[in-house]
């Protein structure tokens, strides 16, 4: 058996050489190199097994882009980022235009980005004056008659009544004199000491003519006596009433 093995090997070599001679175009690539040995890595079960643990040092974050804003509020209030019709709310210096920039601009020349449209408003919108119902002239008087003036409002206060909140009274056109005004006011407020004989404004000036009455002002009604003490006229002397610009408040009247 030992002598037959070399013969078989020689026979095999002859057969392989014969096959290669019969098929000269066939190419047999060389065998692949052997695989490297497998390295077994032990399993790491906790973060302490990693020498590069992330909790030891703070991770390096990417650098932020420089935008020129300190915080998010400066970014939101930057007028350079407003587009469309909202950018018309600010002028070229970034200052707000007020109500002129908040109006609906399309009511004037449309919402458009075309430079040919003058859609920038630099002042508040001025409302167009409405035409009067009655045209002044002879024709209006013939059709509608003479227009009477609107009644003036007076806030009446009783002298010495510190709890009086005021009584509204309208000076109608049929009141032609101060005596007629005194009679109508007496029926309206029922004064304490008697009928109304004298009327004072907030500057403690006596009203002697109907033309001196200011629409919406306060007036103190007395029966001829002087005004009461200051502590009983606090509501009457409050500052919410309209007075004439030429009137002055003398300080000697406010001595308690």
Swiss-Prot record:
GO CC aspect terms: cytoplasm; cytoskeleton
Chain positions covered by the region annotation Partial p25alpha domain: 71-103
One biological process term in Gene Ontology: microtubule polymerization
Main localisation: cytoplasm
Domain of life: Eukaryota
Gene3D superfamilies: Doublecortin domain (3.10.20.230)
PROSITE patterns for this protein: DC
Every Doublecortin domain range: 152-226
Alphabetical list of Pfam families matching this protein: DCX (PF03607), p25-alpha (PF05517)
Compartments (UniProt record): Cytoplasm, Cytoskeleton
Known role: Specifically required in the formation and maintenance of the conoid fibers; the conoid is a component of the cytoskeletal apical complex, which is composed of a left-handed spiral of 14 fibers made from a nontubular tubulin polymer. Promotes the organization, curvature, and stability of the conoid fibers, and probably bridges other conoid components to the tubulin core.
Domain notes per entry: The doublecortin is involved in the binding to microtubules; however, it is not sufficient by itself and requires the partial p25alpha domain. The partial p25 alpha domain binds to microtubules.
Protein's UniProt name: Doublecortin domain-containing protein
Organism this protein belongs to: Toxoplasma gondii (strain ATCC 50861 / VEG)
